[in-house]
Amino acid sequence: MESWKVIMVVTPRGTFEVFYKGEGSPLCVSHLYSVFNSTGDYFADCFTGLYQVFLVNLREAGASEAAHEPFQLRMLESVLDLEAIREELGLPTWAFAGHSTGGMLGLVYGLAAPPFIESTGDY
C-alpha cells in the first residue's frame, strides 16, 4: 500500500504541512483543527483510489503555521489559507472533502471561493 508523503507548502500566508497520496484529480481533505500525520486518515484514504488527495494541517495543527492573532483561526481565514496552499501547489481548482468541522469549513469554502472548488459528483 502506498504511504502518505509529506511536504511543507510555503505560502505568503505561512507554511503548512500537507500530506498527499493517490492519483487523479486533486482533492483537498481537511479538518479545522485535528492533526494529520504520515499514517493518513481513514476518511481521506477512501478517496485515494480516484483522486490525488491533499491532507492539509491548518494553523495550529501538526507542523503548520501557528496563529499569530486569534482571528487567524476563523473559518474564513482558513479558507484563505487553503486557497494560498492550492495556488502554491499550482492547482487551478480542486475538490474539497471534510468531516466534522471540516465539513462546515467546506460549506464556507464553497461560498467564499466557488470558482476554485470542483464538484466530485460522488453524491
Show where each model-derived region lies.
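Active-site loop/oxyanion-hole signature of alpha/beta-hydrolase fold enzymes
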Residues: F54, L58-A97, T101
